[in-house]
């Protein structure tokens, strides 16, 4: 098996700065994503119990079977 000489890598100060800037940008992006998630969590904890119930029912697909205008006790079209 043949061996070849290792490739020499030269890193300049500009390369280091570019790397540091990229790492800083990634850190800031992840922090902003974390902050957005925390804000969404805070919003959901501030909702009233009734609003939470409505949101939950919409999320899992529960719908009201009778429209209030069709309910017999409210004088809707379904009267006999």
UniProtKB/Swiss-Prot annotation:
GO terms for biological process: anaphase-promoting complex-dependent catabolic process; positive regulation of exit from mitosis. Residues 37-54 have a biased composition (Basic and acidic residues). Residues 26-54 are annotated as: Disordered. The keyword Acyltransferase does not apply. Keywords: Acetylation, Chaperone, Ubl conjugation pathway. It comes from the Eukaryota. The keyword Phosphoprotein does not apply. One of its GO terms (cellular component) is cytosol. InterPro entries: APC_suCDC26. The modification N-acetylmethionine is found at residue 1. The APC/C is composed of at least 13 subunits: apc1, apc2, nuc2, apc4, apc5, cut9, apc8, apc10, apc11, hcn1, apc13, apc14 and apc15. Interacts directly (via N-terminus) with cut9. Component of the anaphase promoting complex/cyclosome (APC/C), a cell cycle-regulated E3 ubiquitin-protein ligase complex that controls progression through mitosis and the G1 phase of the cell cycle. The APC/C is thought to confer substrate specificity and, in the presence of ubiquitin-conjugating E2 enzymes, it catalyzes the formation of protein-ubiquitin conjugates that are subsequently degraded by the 26S proteasome. Has a role in assembling cut9 in the 20S APC/cyclosome. This is Anaphase-promoting complex subunit hcn1. It comes from Schizosaccharomyces pombe (strain 972 / ATCC 24843).
